[in-house]
């Protein structure tokens, strides 16, 4: 679950997550993906670059 907004500046970033993830899995360069998606602020870039999906690992503990 990607946060809806950047923690630092508040820009909405969640719509870019699915495309970023799909293109990253294909082996594309993260810099190029983020540039293409229009994510220019380094705080927003950090949100996508450092996010790790752990929701599937946490589901058994509900």
Curated annotation (Swiss-Prot):
Enzyme Commission code: 2.7.7.6
Recorded catalytic activity of this chain's protein: RNA(n) + a ribonucleoside 5'-triphosphate = RNA(n+1) + diphosphate
Gene3D superfamilies (UniProt xref): Homeodomain-like
GO CC annotation: cytoplasm; DNA-directed RNA polymerase complex
Predominant cellular place of this UniProt entry's protein: cytoplasm
Entry's Gene Ontology BP terms: DNA-templated transcription
Annotated Pfam families: RNA_pol_N
GO molecular function: DNA binding; DNA-directed RNA polymerase activity; zinc ion binding
Cofactor(s) this protein requires: Zn(2+)
Keyword list, A-Z: Cytoplasm, DNA-directed RNA polymerase, Metal-binding, Nucleotidyltransferase, Transcription, Transferase, Zinc
Residues holding Zn(2+): 6, 9, 43-44
Record family assignment: Belongs to the archaeal Rpo10/eukaryotic RPB10 RNA polymerase subunit family.
Subunit organization: Part of the RNA polymerase complex.
HAMAP family attached to this UniProt entry: RNApol_arch_Rpo10
Protein's job: DNA-dependent RNA polymerase (RNAP) catalyzes the transcription of DNA into RNA using the four ribonucleoside triphosphates as substrates.
The protein's name in its UniProt record: DNA-directed RNA polymerase subunit Rpo10
Organism listed in the record: Methanoregula boonei (strain DSM 21154 / JCM 14090 / 6A8)
């Amino acid at each position: 679950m990607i946060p809806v907004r950047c923690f630092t500046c508040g820009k909405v970033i969640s719509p870019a997550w699915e495309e970023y993830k799909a293109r990253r899995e294909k082996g594309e360069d993260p810099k190029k993906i983020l540039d293409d998606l229009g994510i220019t602020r380094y705080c927003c870039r950090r949100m996508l670059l450092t996010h790790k999906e752990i929701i599937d690992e946490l589901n058994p503990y509900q």
